[in-house]
Amino acid sequence: MISLIAALAVDRVIGMENAMPWDLPADLAWFKRNTLNKPVVMGRLTWESIGRPLPGRKNIVISSKPGSDDRVQWVKSVDEAIAACGDAEEIMVIGGGRVYEQFLPKAHKLYLTHIDAEVEGDTHFPDYDPDEWESVFSEFHDADAQNSHSYCFEILERR
């Protein structure tokens, strides 16, 4: 099963200059909880923004250029990335924008954090048809001392 996990501000903004323009430790904990012990697939720019392999997960990076870091597995295509995951029960696609776009048609599940923030961004989550997805989980949280904005965790499954 292929799943996409992303945090989206208003207008599906997911990043600005290769970073996330908000401070939400609760979202990072949600991300870790849902990706731990699963393969994670990302693009080269996402890999560079993280700067290190995510522990407890097989890290796979899609890039047209050969990678030099042997702590992760480098592949050149979506199909190679899927093959590199072997018989994993769930593959977690963690970004960025182009990688989400390539995997969305193959995805069975979306783990989305909707952030109540209007921020400028240069990277967006791809547009998806809400009629193709059913919300199976939703949990709202107000902003607090640790989290800069209110947010809602949602899990969608393809109908």
UniProtKB/Swiss-Prot annotation:
* Gene Ontology MF annotations: dihydrofolate reductase activity; NADP binding
Positions binding substrate in this chain are I5, D27, R52, R57, T113
Is ATP-binding there in the keyword field? Answer: no
Q: Which InterPro entries match?
A: DHFR, DHFR-like_dom_sf, DHFR_CS, DHFR_dom
The free-text function statement in the UniProt record for this protein reads:
Key enzyme in folate metabolism. Catalyzes an essential reaction for de novo glycine and purine synthesis, and for DNA precursor synthesis.
Q: Provide the family line.
A: Belongs to the dihydrofolate reductase family.
UniProt-recorded name of the protein = Dihydrofolate reductase
From the broadest rank down, the organism's phylogenetic lineage runs: Bacteria, Pseudomonadati, Pseudomonadota, Gammaproteobacteria, Enterobacterales
